[in-house]
């Protein structure tokens, strides 16, 4: 993912910075414990598309 794009993307719920998990192709919001998918190199930052993360996945 382009670093410039990653620098401007934020969580739609809390506006926190998102962190890339390149292995899982997801953008992670640690504050809300959500993972937003990246499909075909396009980040899908819709809350309905996000999956909840466990505390272990955040660490």
UniProtKB/Swiss-Prot annotation:
GO terms for cellular component: cytosol. Pfam families: Trm112p (PF03966). Coiled coil: none annotated. Belongs to the UPF0434 family. This is UPF0434 protein Pnec_0311. It comes from Polynucleobacter necessarius subsp. necessarius (strain STIR1).
């Amino acid at each position: 993912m382009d670093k410039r794009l990653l620098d401007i993307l934020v969580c739609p719920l809390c506006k926190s910075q998102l962190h890339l998990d390149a292995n899982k192709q997801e953008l992670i919001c640690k504050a809300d414990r959500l993972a937003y998918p990246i499909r075909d190199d396009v980040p899908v930052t819709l809350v309905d598309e996000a999956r909840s993360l466990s505390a272990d996945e955040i660490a």
